[in-house]
């Protein structure tokens, strides 16, 4: 990054660009969350399951996010690790209404946290306990317990209850992530 780029970021003329990985099991709401974070005129009305991955962009008050929306289908999860080095933050989405798959989500999270490209970095992780509007949803506190998030000691993390369709809880999460990215060296 050149001197003019740094100066324009400091003056607020240009936003710092960050690469974020959006991970989680299939049907957890990753694509819907990313879609809802985009400006309303850029939002898609028809959300389809992600095949492989897609790249989406949105902006916050001080950052420009490039999000790698990774498919959560079992056959595509092995692709995740190819993007770990580039990621400056992680959004991990959990379907809080699907108790049966919470064990699989925990296994995938453990695999992620123990990967050499993630393990020794203080990369911030934002968890969305999504689908809180559904009858069978458990609280974000319960999701945190089921995933044993309290054991994550070497990375900043935060969990937000969310309803991606209504957009509830999303801004709180993005605000936290923005603060972490600006203060944490990964």
UniProtKB/Swiss-Prot annotation:
A lipid is attached at residue 2 (N-myristoyl glycine). InterPro entries: Arl6, P-loop_NTPase, Small_GTP-bd, Small_GTPase_ARF, Small_GTPase_ARF/SAR. GO terms for biological process: brain development; cilium assembly; fat cell differentiation; protein localization to non-motile cilium; protein polymerization; protein targeting to membrane; protein transport from ciliary membrane to plasma membrane; regulation of smoothened signaling pathway. SMART domains: ARF, SAR. Its main location: membrane. Coiled coil: none annotated. Keywords: Cell membrane, Cell projection, Cilium biogenesis/degradation, Cytoplasm, Cytoskeleton, GTP-binding, Lipoprotein, Magnesium, Membrane, Metal-binding, Myristate, Nucleotide-binding, Protein transport, Transport. It holds the Pfam family Arf. PROSITE patterns: ARF. It is a peripheral membrane protein. GTP binds at residues 24-31, 50, 69-73, 130-133, 164. Mg(2+) binds at residue 50. It is found in: Cell projection, Cilium membrane; Cytoplasm, Cytoskeleton, Cilium axoneme; Cytoplasm, Cytoskeleton, Cilium basal body. GO terms for molecular function: GTP binding; GTPase activity; metal ion binding; phospholipid binding. One of its GO terms (cellular component) is axoneme. It comes from the Eukaryota. PANTHER family: ADP RIBOSYLATION FACTOR-RELATED (PTHR11711). Involved in membrane protein trafficking at the base of the ciliary organelle. Mediates recruitment onto plasma membrane of the BBSome complex which would constitute a coat complex required for sorting of specific membrane proteins to the primary cilia. Together with the BBSome complex and LTZL1, controls SMO ciliary trafficking and contributes to the sonic hedgehog (SHH) pathway regulation. May regulate cilia assembly and disassembly and subsequent ciliary signaling events such as the Wnt signaling cascade. Isoform 2 may be required for proper retinal function and organization. Belongs to the small GTPase superfamily. Arf family. Interacts with SEC61B, ARL6IP1, ARL6IP2, ARL6IP3, ARL6IP4 ARL6IP5 and ARL6IP6. Interacts (GTP-bound form) with the BBSome a complex that contains BBS1, BBS2, BBS4, BBS5, BBS7, BBS8/TTC8, BBS9 and BBIP10. Interacts (GTP-free form) with IFT27. This is ADP-ribosylation factor-like protein 6. It comes from Pongo abelii.
